[in-house]
Each structure stands twice: as structure tokens, then as C-alpha cells.
């Protein structure tokens, strides 16, 4: 069960969460309201006044992507630190997170931990240098709470009160009537190194019940559990005779430090050990170390100038048994009203596997109650406490609140910035879990540790990165922490420099080391600007989602989605987020106009199904059932899937609780806008019957994903032709179909104008062809795999547009129509007559004169800047060569370049006829090109390329006669590393990089519609 209960300071768990959110919501409303109403409130984007400003074209530093910046602890040079901050700033990024990570360094002694460890004077000097230069450059710097991960503190020993703890068990089998005499059974697992003390918590006996046994669990009769702790002699021996019937098991329970150190340590002297994440002592050890040893007056001042967030990585507590804290028995008793010890057999773990089990339903209920108690301790004493401490320093807390069996959705609501990851998250629903917590709490940012791929060091392409992140942005992500940027060098590093995760286990690691060492760094400003514009849109205003999916168990990073919505609803345009019980007690959890959280995500319906984490059992806590009833009575449509006419409590029920739950559900199901169904295929019809439709609609299923943000001025729709997970097969294909977008803002005169926002160029233009129906707008969406389109719906004149009064096109047989200045024009690649129907009712015919045929260049000159290891790990030698190509091939297919990496500049010429005029133009289609590329025509740079659809309009750069086209392509380093470091990279197959084509220049002619 989960009823609000009093905690030590007189606040219930739910009150704790609500209190943390209230201040954030109030601050957001005050900042956003201006002269508008609460329903219209929306924070400005990066301080910009709104869509009329240039915030989209030139995104602010605050919304630009960031780097995870890996240091070899404190073995850094302050001049190099300042130089790397400049490199990050010059490339157009917004900041960095300093993290002590050096998995690639096997011999840790070379890092001189005694003098240059995490937290040492050289480390502090490096942090100060980073903050000082960041303040000058307008960047912000984040700091991990400890070295590597999980959070650990130098000087804490495994036996300390503040150290992480485990509960381990011992066992002995007895036949009926047999006597056990001797030392209490010792733990089945030996203690970790450095653990010198362990305490006997309890000894129990229980009768084996084969009917409850599973493949891994020994079944026990719960009524037979006997506490033998008081019979243990002072010398640790036990004498006990089992009853005559059945087989019996003696179970001993021991508590001790887990002895876990942060990943790939040691990082400090003295060594750091992971802290207790469930007890105030663990948090106090973290904050106390910072206060006493790190936060000098200088550092405090610099944090105010350029500090961003403290960061905690995913909570990967490792133990052979059950993660423990001494207060768990008392906390469990306060939470449930029952003692914990009789239930311990159903809870103990060995190597992450359950050891014993009672009857299945009782076991489920016990485990639910335990992990809910565990979660409350984690969120209260760790997440909230660290967040409040960060605030006291003018910082925020960003964290990945998953890895334990805790309510990560609730954690996301407490955190200033929750974060997920592209490597560890199984699919987009993992991000939607965190997005629900963020949006219900009134926060803005959902961050993502982005771009780590197993075994892909020095072969990761930005194309792959963008395809990964395209879907994540549709699922709620709006900040990217790129994984990552390695400090230049470290002892033992090989060319092209220190890389935190490579080599890894003798082969290429995960996590790219971006920076000047990478050939694509010459083009990375285009990537940074693109990501900044996407972030700017997705951090503007308020996120909207169609449906809230209720989760009885708020885990994340599981890959478990929602019935119907994940597989069927999303391909039809629906959006959803996940909520857990504590979020229903937030100040934002109100209903108005049939919407839940109307000033936030404004969910149109709540969907409830059985608990996926417990065999889809139709469970509801009575407190949650009561809140659902209140929301439904206020007008919120609710759909329940499963046997919720016969609900069960998720935890062990109190006397009469099951009856109260059934009564609440009977009242809920009796309301007119509450529907119960038994087949997940009926979800769509149930929603339609309640009058609920999505904000984005298309007639047939599609791989189109969407995210919706609402500001005072506009509805922003982020559209991506993406996939639900990296492993989805078959691959995503190109799409081309009509999409209807709902406009939720009233405009003067009732006119809704759609604008196309190009995140590659920063241009915002009125869309020329669309249909409108009562404010809803239907546009054509044609996207290649992974490609993105951003549409804004708003009033005439947004983004400086001057065409708002002009009629638009509702139908045409022209391949393209657009507004050019104040004129509506037809663009065609072929001569002929084009018929266009306008919104004014007029039908216009336009004659397109002759258009030159597409041109395929037949010969290319390729100038190569080939890169080799230099005389030092950070030194690169350059060899220049020139080739003439009659056929475009990947470098791996050109003998002279098969193992090359660097920059290739492809140059060709095309001749355009004497009749070429300003009415002509052309698109340059590059075909297959990898990795990054830039185009120059007649010495002038073309607009940035869409990396996932490398076609660029070069019309304004062309002239009659001879034209010189140059394509500069960056080639990743892996092919060179295959031969330079064969012990690490030799097993990697040659990669096909370069300009492969086919390349075409496709002329068009543009004619004004009469």
C-alpha cells in the first residue's frame, strides 16, 4: 500500500515532492506570466522576447549542446584547460561537465593519484581555470559530485556509517526433527576488499514449501517463519531443533559495507568509497567533503559566475546481496505499519537473483512495499537533499535517477534537470518516463547523455548521432550532453591523444573523443548550431502530450512501454508520457477543461493498465485510486485496461483496505467519462468515444514522431522520421504524406499561419502550401530516415514574415511552391504549365519555360589532407596528395586512400547555358557522403547541409558559364588507426567514408504565380 505517512520532519513523502515542485512552478509562472493569464504562461526561450526575435537563427549559449569533458583526475595543466574551453566555445557549444574518467588507463599509478587525484590541489586549480575561462566565454561548467560514478567520497571507508551497505544472507538446510548446532550460517558471499566488520541482523527459520518454489527461488511457508535471533549465544553459535514435519531452512542476515569504489579507480588518495544513497549520513559525507576540502572562496565565487549544475551519473550500486541502510526496518514500519523482518526471506538477493519466495501474490506485495520504502528513502535523503544543497550554492542538480528499483519518475520531478542516455536506454519510452516527471513538476529541461556506441571509438559519425537523437527529442529530450570530449593527454596515451574509454578491454571503446583531433571538428559548428536550434524550440514554452500513462511502479531504463500507445498510437500521431503515484499529489495535478495539468502538459486523458513490472496485475494503491476518482470527478477522461473491476492493492493490504479499493474503483468506473476495456486493441476506440484526439494526426501509420510545445505566440511541432529504438528492424524508410497539426492558440482574426523553421540554416519562412480547417493546419511532410522538420503555427507576421495577408496554395501540380519576398512562386525542374488553387478560391495557371537538364559531373579533383600519428600522442602529421577521379568511390575503395583519414576537398566544374538568369537555380544533390561535409560554389559557402538529406540549394551562387563546385568532406580517424594501432583497432573493418554520390546538379526555374 502507499498511504501518506509522517516522516521524521513531519512531512509525508508526497508532501516532500510537492514542496520541492511548488517553488519551481511558482517561479516559472511569475517569470512567464507577464500580462497574460496562467493558461497562456510560458517561459521565454533563452531570454528572447519570442518568435519575432532572432533566438532561432542564433541560439543562445544556454540552449546549445554541452560536452561531457573527461579528465585524468587532476593530472591536468591549467593552460591546456583554458585552451580546451576555448575550443568548445569556438565550436559553438554551450558548456561542459567535468568528469574524472579514465577507463583506458590500465596502470593507474601513472596518474599520480597521491598528488593529482580527484579533489587534489591540481584538480581544484584545473576546475578554477575552467570556470574562469568559461565565464569569459559565456559558457557554464558542470561538476560531477564525485570521481567517476557512483557518488563516492575520498576518505570514507567501507566500514563507515556513510558508506554504501549491503544485506547478505547465509543458509543451512534441516530435515524435520533435525537439530542445528554451531556457528550461525555465515554469508554465502565473502566481503569485499576493505570490509572488516559485519553485523548479524537476524536469524530465522522457515519451512520449505515446494508449491511456492520457482526455477531460482526456494519456496517458503510465510506462516512458519520464526525469529531465532534472541537464541544466538554471545559466541555466535546457535542451537535449534526443527519441527518434525517438512524440510526447513535456517537463514541468517548480515549487514556490512559493500566496499564499492567508483568505476575504474582509484581516483584519489585516500581512496574514495561509494556512499549510502538511502541515509542522510551518505549525503552529508558528500556535501561535507565539498564544503571542507573543495569549496574555497575562489571556487565559490567562480561557481556563481560560470557554474551550471552538479551532476550524478546513473546509480549503479553493486553488491552481491541486497542494497541496504540501517534505517530500512524503521522506515518500512512507518510506511506500512508492519515490521520488515518477517518479510526478509522474500527480499534477499544473491548476485541480483531472488533467493526465496512466499505465495506469489504475497511475494509481489512484499517486494512492492519494500522497494517503495527504498525509493522514498532514496528520493528524500539523496535526491532532494543534494538538490537543496546545490541550490544553496546557486547551482542546480542534474542526475540520471535510475539504476535502482526506485521511482525514477518521481525523482525526475524532484530534480532540476533529469537526464537519460542514448546508450543505456532501451527505447523512447524510457525518456517518456522522465519527461512525465519533469513536466508535471513544471521544470523545463530533460537532458540526454548522447552518442555513446559500443566499439565505435573514432568511427562514430554525426549522421549516426543525429539519427539516434532525432527520436529522443520527440520523446521529451531538449538538452544534449555529448559523450564526450577527452582532455588532450595522459601518461601512456597513444595518438591522437588521451581517450577516456578507448582502448576498452583491448579494443575500441565507447564514447567518442570529439575535439580538434577529429577531422569533422572543422564542420562541427554546423552541428552545434543545429542542436542549439532544436533545443531552443524544445525548451520554449510548455511541453504538451496527448495522454498520461499511469505507472504503479515508476522505474525507468527498462524499455517497457505502454499498451497500444507505443506500438499503435505513436505511429498514428499520439504522444504520451508516464506518471507515477506521487506526481498526482503535485500542485500541478489539477483538472480544468478536461485537461490534467492544464498549465503544463495538459493531458487530455489518463490511461491505466496493469503493473507491467508485476505480471500486468491490475493493482492500484488506495491513495492513487482516491486521486484518480477526484480527477475523474473534475472531468478528466480515464481509460482503464484490464480487470480493474476486481482491483488488487500493490502492497500487502491493511484490514479492510481491499474493500475500500474496490469501492473506490466501482465509483470511478461508474462515471460517464471513465471507460474500462479488456482488449488493448480497443484503446483507440475508447479514446475516440470519450472525444479525445491527438494534436498530430495522419491517416495511416507512419514512422513520424512528434513533440509539441506551446508558447504565447505559437504552437511548435517538432517532427522526425525516427525509430522507437536503435535495434528496430526493418530500418526506417522515407515518408511522404499529409499531417494535420492542431493550433491551440487563438489568433487575431482567426488566421493561423504555418511557418517552417529550418534548424540547419536558422531560417523561418511561411509555408506556402497547406489547408486549414477551424484552426487546424494540414501540411505535407516528406522526410528521409532520421530527418527533422519543425513547424510553428501562429499569427501572421511571426519571424518577420510579410506574407501573412497573401493567399496561400491549397492544391497544385507543381513540385514546389514558396513565398519569395512578397510573391508566391512556382518552382519546377521541368518546363510546362502548372495549375495552382489558392485559398482565396482562385485557380491560376503558370507557364514554366525551359529548364536545363540535371548535370552529373564526370570528373573530380580530390585534394587530400591525410593524417598520421606524429612524434607525440597529441601531434598529427599531415600528408597532402591530389588525385583525379572519374568515378566517385569511398576512400576504402581507392587504393591510395584505403587507410587514410582527414579532409578531402572534391572539386569539379559545371557549365550553365547562356540563357541562365536570376529566375534559375539548382539543388546540389550529394547522394552518399560521410562524415560531415560543406559545399562551396564559386568561392562562396553554401548554407549548411542537412546531414541526413544532403541536398543544398545553390541557386543564388550559380552563374551562366563555368561554375566551380567544391565539396569538403571530413573522414573519421578509424581507418588510419586500423594500421597505426592494430592491437586495438586492427579487427575493425575498413569503413566506407567519403563522397560516394551520385552527385547531381538539378536546375529549377522559378516563376511568379499570376
List where the protein language model places each region.
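N-terminal export signals
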Residues: 15-36
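C-terminal segment of N-terminal export signals and the immediately downstream linker at the start
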Residues: 31-48
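An acidic-aromatic loop/edge-strand motif
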Residues: 149-152, 165, 171-175, 184-224, ...
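N-terminal secretory signal peptides
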Residues: 1-11, 25-26
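Carbohydrate-binding surfaces of carbohydrate-active enzymes
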Residues: 82, 118-147, 155, 300-309, ...
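Exposed aromatic-hydrophobic patches
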Residues: 778-780, 951-956
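Aromatic-lined ligand-binding clefts that engage carbohydrates, nucleic acids, or primary amines
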Residues: 910-912, 916-938, 965-969
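Mature extracytoplasmic enzyme cores
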Residues: 47-58, 64, 76-91, 95, ...
Amino acid at each position: 500500500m502507499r498511504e501518506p505517512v509522517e516522516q521524521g520532519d513531519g512531512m509525508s513523502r508526497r508532501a516532500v515532492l510537492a514542496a520541492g515542485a511548488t517553488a519551481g512552478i511558482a517561479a516559472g509562472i511569475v517569470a512567464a506570466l507577464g500580462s497574460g493569464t496562467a493558461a497562456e504562461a510560458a517561459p521565454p526561450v533563452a531570454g528572447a522576447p519570442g518568435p519575432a526575435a532572432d533566438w532561432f537563427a542564433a541560439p543562445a549559449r544556454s540552449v546549445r549542446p554541452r560536452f561531457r569533458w573527461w579528465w585524468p583526475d587532476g593530472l591536468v595543466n591549467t593552460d591546456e584547460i583554458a585552451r580546451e574551453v576555448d575550443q568548445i566555445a569556438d565550436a559553438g557549444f554551450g558548456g561542459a561537465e567535468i568528469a574524472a574518467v579514465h577507463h583506458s588507463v590500465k596502470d593507474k599509478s601513472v596518474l599520480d593519484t597521491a598528488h593529482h587525484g580527484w579533489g587534489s590541489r591540481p584538480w581544484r586549480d584545473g576546475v578554477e581555470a575552467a570556470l574562469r575561462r568559461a565565464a569569459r566565454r559565456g559558457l557554464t561548467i558542470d561538476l560531477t559530485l564525485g570521481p567517476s560514478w557512483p557518488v563516492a567520497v575520498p576518505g570514507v571507508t567501507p566500514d563507515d556509517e556513510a558508506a554504501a551497505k549491503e544485506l547478505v544472507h547465509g543458509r543451512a538446510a534441516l530435515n524435520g526433527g533435525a537439530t542445528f548446532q554451531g556457528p550461525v550460517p555465515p554469508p554465502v558471499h565473502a566481503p569485499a576488499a576493505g570490509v572488516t566488520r559485519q553485523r548479524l541482523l537476524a536469524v530465522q527459520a522457515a519451512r520449505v514449501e515446494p508449491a511456492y518454489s520457482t526455477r531460482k527461488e526456494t519456496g517458503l511457508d510465510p506462516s512458519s517463519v520464526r525469529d531465532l535471533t534472541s537464541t544466538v549465544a554471545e559466541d555466535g553459535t546457535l542451537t535449534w531443533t526443527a519441527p518434525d514435519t517438512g524440510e526447513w531452512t535456517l537463514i541468517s542476515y548480515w549487514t556490512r559495507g559493500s566496499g564499492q569504489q567508483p568505476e575504474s579507480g582509484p581516483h584519489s588518495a585516500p581512496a574514495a568509497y561509494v556512499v549510502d544513497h538511502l541515509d542522510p549520513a551518505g549525503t552529508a559525507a558528500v556535501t561535507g567533503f565539498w564544503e571542507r576540502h573543495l569549496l574555497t572562496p575562489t571556487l565559490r565565487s567562480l561557481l556563481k559566475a560560470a557554474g551550471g549544475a552538479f551532476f550524478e551519473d546513473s546509480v549503479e550500486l553493486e553488491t552481491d546481496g541486497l542494497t541496504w541502510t540501517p534505517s530500512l526496518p524503521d522506515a518500512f514500519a512507518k510506511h506500512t505499519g508492519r515490521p520488515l523482518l518477517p518479510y526478509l526471506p522474500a527480499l534477499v538477493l544473491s548476485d541480483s537473483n531472488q533467493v526465496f519466495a512466499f505465495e506469489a501474490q504475497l511475494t509481489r506485495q512484499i517486494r512492492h512495499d519494500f522497494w517503495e520504502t527504498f525509493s522514498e528513502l532514496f528520493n528524500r535523503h539523496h535526491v532532494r537533499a543534494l538538490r537543496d544543497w546545490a541550490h544553496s550554492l546557486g547551482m542546480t542538480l542534474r542526475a540520471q535517477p535510475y539504476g535502482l528499483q526506485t521511482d525514477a519518475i518521481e525523482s525526475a520531478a524532484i530534480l532540476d534537470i533529469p537526464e537519460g542516455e542514448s546508450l543505456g536506454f532501451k527505447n523512447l519510452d524510457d525518456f517518456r518516463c522522465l519527461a512525465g516527471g519533469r513536466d508535471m513538476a513544471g521544470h523545463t529541461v530533460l537532458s540526454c547523455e548522447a552518442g555513446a556506441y559500443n566499439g565505435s571509438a573514432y568511427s562514430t559519425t554525426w549522421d549516426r548521432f543525429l539519427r539516434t537523437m532525432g527520436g529522443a527529442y520527440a520523446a521529451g529530450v531538449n538538452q544534449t550532453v555529448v559523450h564526450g570530449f577527452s582532455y588532450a593527454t595522459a601518461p601512456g596515451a597513444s595518438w591522437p591523444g588521451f581517450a577516456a574509454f578507448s582502448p576498452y578491454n583491448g579494443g575500441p571503446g565507447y564514447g567518442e573523443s570529439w575535439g580538434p583531433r577529429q577531422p569533422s571538428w572543422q564542420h562541427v559548428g554546423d552541428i552545434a548550431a543545429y542542436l542549439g536550434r532544436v533545443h531552443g524550440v524544445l525548451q520554449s514554452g510548455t511541453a504538451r502530450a496527448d495522454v498520461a500513462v499511469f505507472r504503479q511502479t515508476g522505474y525507468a531504463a527498462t524499455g517497457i512501454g505502454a499498451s497500444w500507445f507505443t506500438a499503435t498510437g505513436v505511429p498514428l500521431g499520439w504522444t504520451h508520457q508516464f506518471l507515477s503515484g506521487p506526481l498526482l499529489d503535485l500542485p500541478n495535478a489539477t483538472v480544468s477543461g478536461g485537461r490534467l495539468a492544464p498549465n503544463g502538459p495538459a493531458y487530455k486523458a489518463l490511461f491505466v493498465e496493469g503493473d507491467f513490472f508485476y505480471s500486468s496485475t491490475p493493482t492500484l494503491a488506495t491513495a492513487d485510486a482516491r486521486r484518480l476518482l477526484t480527477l475523474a470527478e473534475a472531468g478528466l477522461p480515464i481509460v482503464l485496461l484490464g480487470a480493474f473491476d476486481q482491483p488488487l492493492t500493490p502492497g500487502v493490504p491493511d484490514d479492510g483496505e481491499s474493500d475500500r479499493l474496490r469501492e473506490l474503483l466501482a465509483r470511478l468506473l461508474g462515471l460517464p467519462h471513465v471507460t474500462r476495456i479488456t482488449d488493448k486493441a480497443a484503446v483507440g476506440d475508447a479514446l475516440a468515444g470519450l472525444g479525445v484526439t491527438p494534436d498530430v494526426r495522419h491517416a495511416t501509420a507512419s514512422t513520424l514522431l512528434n513533440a509539441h510545445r506551446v508558447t504565447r505566440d505559437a504552437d511548435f511541432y517538432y517532427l522526425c522520421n525516427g525509430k522507437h529504438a536503435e535495434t528496430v528492424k526493418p530500418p526506417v524508410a522515407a515518408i511522404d504524406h499529409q499531417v494535420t497539426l492542431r493550433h491551440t492558440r487563438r489568433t487575431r482574426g482567426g488566421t493561423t499561419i504555418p511557418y517552417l523553421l529550418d534548424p540547419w540554416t536558422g531560417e523561418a519562412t511561411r509555408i506556402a502550401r497547406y489547408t486549414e480547417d477551424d484552426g487546424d493546419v494540414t501540411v505535407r511532410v516528406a522526410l528521409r530516415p532520421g530527418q527533422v522538420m519543425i513547424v510553428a503555427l501562429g499569427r501572421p507576421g511571426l519571424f518577420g514574415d510579410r506574407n501573412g495577408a497573401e493567399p496561400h496554395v491549397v492544391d497544385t501540380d507543381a513540385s514546389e511552391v514558396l513565398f519569395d519576398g512578397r510573391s508566391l512562386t512556382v518552382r519546377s525542374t521541368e518546363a510546362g504549365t502548372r495549375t495552382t488553387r489558392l485559398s482565396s478560391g482562385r485557380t491560376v495557371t503558370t507557364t514554366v519555360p525551359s529548364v536545363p537538364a540535371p548535370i552529373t559531373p564526370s570528373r573530380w579533383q580530390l585534394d587530400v589532407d591525410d593524417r598520421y600519428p606524429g612524434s607525440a600522442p597529441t601531434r598529427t602529421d599531415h600528408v597532402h596528395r591530389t588525385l583525379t577521379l572519374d568515378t566517385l568511390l569511398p576512400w576504402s575503395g581507392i587504393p591510395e586512400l584505403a587507410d587514410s583519414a582527414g579532409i578531402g576537398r572534391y572539386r569539379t566544374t559545371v557549365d550553365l547555358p547562356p540563357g541562365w538568369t536570376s529566375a534559375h537555380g539548382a539543388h546540389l544533390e550529394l547522394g552518399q557522403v560521410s562524415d560531415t561535409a560543406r559545399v562551396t560554389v564559386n568561392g562562396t559557402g553554401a548554407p549548411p547541409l542537412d546531414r541526413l538529406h544532403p541536398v543544398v540549394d545553390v541557386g543564388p551562387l550559380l552563374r551562366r558559364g563555368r561554375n566551380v563546385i567544391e565539396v569538403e568532406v571530413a573522414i573519421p580517424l578509424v581507418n588510419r588507426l586500423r594500421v597505426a594501432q592494430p592491437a586495438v583497432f586492427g579487427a575493425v573493418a575498413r569503413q566506407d567514408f567519403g563522397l560516394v554520390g551520385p552527385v547531381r546538379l538539378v536546375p529549377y526555374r522559378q516563376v511568379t504565380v499570376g
